[in-house]
Amino acid sequence: INSIGATIVPVLVGYLIGTISSETSIANANPALFLAMGIFALAFIVLFSMNIPEPHAAAAVANGVKNSHSPLSFRHFVLGAIAIFLYVGIEVGIPNIANLFMTGSTEANGLGIDTTTAGSVVGTYWFLMFIGRLTGGSLGAKFSSKGMLSFVSLLGLVFVLLAIFIPETQMVNMPVFKADISFGLAQVPMSIMFLILCGLCTSVMWGGIFNLATEGLGKYTAATSGQSRLPSQ
């Protein structure tokens, strides 16, 4: 659901905002902001009305035994928390920077692409993450977390290097939704395409890092599961 929503929202927001120009103001984003407020309100109502039991937390309170060690005493857990912090910056940074570059005016060294098309390109990144998670889930039993994480990290590095060194004049056609919500092909720099392909790589990184960071922690697993999420917030 998360990946599907992330695929659709950039296209929808791009359509609601319209073409960015010198006259564009924050008021153009009001429809998208009102939509976000409605989603947050709905999520609050659903969570407030549901009773979600937490048996592990209740058992820990009932036990009342203070652990002599902290989860931070495990070196691989600390490294995993740092890795998740860096990963989240990369995961959200790639589509955000790509979107700013595509929608920026040509006077500001941007591409001047309309927001709907740019949002569709960015949505492809999140859609590839969805595909990657499905693929990673089916292959998870056949390959170790370390092996899978090493492979996608190397592949992502190759994609980023290609995006850096390929000239912006090298163009490629990508399937997108356009400003009139018609579906077709749009020319974007090949470097943008390689950044979008990084979605396949980032799709399984969080799970791989989490598995390696919490491996062999025994009774500390529950505590570290929550703490390892803090860098991603």
Describe the role of every protein-language-model region:
Residues 9-14, 70-126:
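Extracytoplasmic gate region of multi-pass secondary transporters
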Residues 7, 126-134:
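Residue-level signature of mid-helix packing/kink "hotspots" within the transmembrane helices
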Residues 1, 203-221, 225-226:
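Intracellular juxtamembrane helix-capping segments at the cytosolic ends
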Residues 1-17, 229-233:
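Glycine-rich segments within core transmembrane alpha-helices of 12-TM secondary carriers
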Residues 17, 132-145, 170:
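Helix-to-loop junctions at the C-terminal end of transmembrane segments
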Residues 54-80, 182:
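Juxtamembrane intracellular "pre-TM" segments in multi-pass secondary transporters
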Residues 143-209:
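C-terminal transmembrane helical hairpin of 12-TM major facilitator-type secondary transporters
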Residues 9, 13-19, 34-60:
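C-terminal membrane-cytosol helix-exit motif in multi-pass small-molecule transporters
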